[in-house]
Amino acid sequence: MDVIQSIDLITKNTAVRGGKPCIAGTGLRVTDLVIAHLFHKRSAEELTADYELSLSQVYAALAYYYQHKDDLDKDIRHQVLNARMIKERTVSIQH
């Protein structure tokens, strides 16, 4: 009989970051690491230094992302659109 083991490194709490999946014990969203990894080309080792995390925390976040890719990709697209809107508003205010 197989026993599935869980790694308790990713949490969701409505009181932290609106219930978005975060690395346990931090307010760091899984999507924050994924964006740094995929778009800014940061390696897992670089992410450990950038965010003061263990390698197991980084790999847990990446594994969680790939297991929930569709939902988290929607969240990332939403974050990118919000960032663009904020940037456009800031630029228009400055001019």
Q: Could you say what each language-model-derived stretch is?
A:
Residues D2-I4, L9-I10, V16, L38-F39, ...:
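Long, charge-rich, low-complexity intrinsically disordered regions
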Residues D8-L28:
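Short, Lys/Arg-enriched anionic-surface-contact patches
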Residues I23-G25, E52-L55:
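Structural motif
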Residues G27-K41:
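Short, amphipathic alpha-helical "recognition" segments used to contact nucleic acids or chromatin
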